[in-house]
Amino acid sequence: MYFAILGTMSRTCVRAYAVFAIAIMVLTVAWFAFSISQAIQRNTVGAQQRFAQVIRRIAPRVTSKRQLTDAEADFIQNLCKNDDLIMALNIFSNRVQLFSWTYDDLMFVAGGGSELVPRSSSLFIKIFSGRVPYQAKDECLLFTAALRVLTPANIFFRGCVVFLVMLTLTISSMVFLVIEYLSVRRFQCAQGDARPRPAGPQGTARSRTDEAQVSPGTPPECPVSVF
């Protein structure tokens, strides 16, 4: 009865730990997906504000609606390169391209007019467009920019958290399995020792019993002949 209870407890512990480990993995993956989704929504608002700031910094420096000077182009290019969020920027004036810059030429293709067309759709990049009145109020500058709404640092941090949780869960699972294996082995050994051992041949058992009944020092009985 005792060993049966131990076996039942061992199986219950294994099942409980399996449920616990699966729940931790599911919750970790769900947290990663949820946090990424929340970060994208939150950073989209921040990227839109950054785009508005970039427009306000660039628009006053554009002195010609036909062509930018070298100083103006260098200023805008350095502004884009030093910004971690800007992936591409186009500036048009009456469908005349004044400026075009991309972080990676392989990420975007030429679209109609002033459009920025990504080669592949991505949840991490958003396209923003805005118009700013030029010197004459009937004319305007058209800005189109692609901004990152999730930086590699954000993904790396969340990935590290998931990795550490999975690593801890893996190590704890290995330790649990080793402890459980040793417990099962001890249980099997104890169960084997508790089993009754088979008796030997009946003759041998009887002779040992007879020998045990004869006290030491008692002379053997001799047969008495009757005349």
From Swiss-Prot:
Main location: membrane
Membrane topology label: Multi-pass membrane protein
Cellular component annotations (GO), alphabetically ordered: plasma membrane
Compartments, as annotated in UniProt: Cell membrane
UniProt feature, compositional bias: Pro residues: 217-227
Keyword Transmembrane helix among UniProt keywords: yes
Keyword annotations of the record: Cell membrane, Membrane, Transmembrane, Transmembrane helix
Keyword Lipid biosynthesis: no
Stretches for region Disordered: 192-227
Residues spanning the membrane: 13-35, 155-177
Superkingdom of the source species: Bacteria
Protein name: Uncharacterized protein TP_0173
Species the sequence originates in: Treponema pallidum (strain Nichols)
